[in-house]
Amino acid sequence: KEEERKKEEERRKEEERKGRKEQNKQMTFLMGAFFTGLALIFFILIFQFNSVSKPAIIMLAIFLSLIGVFGGIVITGSAFVIMMTMMGIIALAGIVVNNGVVLLDYAQLLIDRKKHEKGLGKNQYLEKSDLFESIVTAGKARLRPVLLTAITTILGLIPLAIGLNINFFTLFGEFDANIYFGGDNVIFWGPLAWTVIYGLIVATFLTLIIVPILFFLITTFKMWLRHKMKPNMQTELIH
């Protein structure tokens, strides 16, 4: 009996080692896919905006949205399922990028219109008050699309997250939906759905508040930097 118990323990330890090894492989692959995807998104956004600052703001919003993911997992005490949670994070990154692009692109459009009205060149900057007004107007105009994206995505994922099952064959054939909660589906798909839900709640706040603030601060810093460099350039020309 003692030998059998030892063999059972060794077999269990071996299975645990294999499980950990497989998890590490999955984690390595998904982390590589995540950062490769982010790099591709970043370069595409650079060509889209013809700027580095706006893509950098959107990338920062993606990383900050992870606060919502891990915060939600910790608060609810959910299990961190490597495969599905990482897939949820990758899906979340796409939504965050979409919302950020919608907001910043419209803000830049309003800024360009304001420049045209004031007769400013493409490389010139607006006054702080005009810049602030354009960004606030863009935030108000894009409030509804960003909120609707978040609400519809969250509502669409809730049945998957709670494991709502409906048998459509019996619903149309016998008028009995056979509705029940749980099952194998929620074990597999639940972590992915909750990951996107947790992250999207925080990401929506980031898109509407943090992203415009960062855009304003970075543009203001560029204005200050150009103002600082201009006298130096004039001094060099005089000498």
Where are these regions (language model features)?
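Interfacial helix-loop-helix hairpins and adjacent transmembrane helices
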Residues: 112-133, 165-187, 213-239
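Short beta-alpha junctions and helix-cap segments that line functional grooves
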Residues: 26-30, 54-55, 71, 183
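Hydrophobic transmembrane alpha-helices and their membrane-interface caps
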Residues: 40-142, 148-166, 172, 198, ...
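Extracytoplasmic/periplasmic membrane-proximal domains and adjacent transmembrane bundles
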Residues: 1-4, 8-37, 46-49, 114-133
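Structured binding elements
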Residues: 188, 192
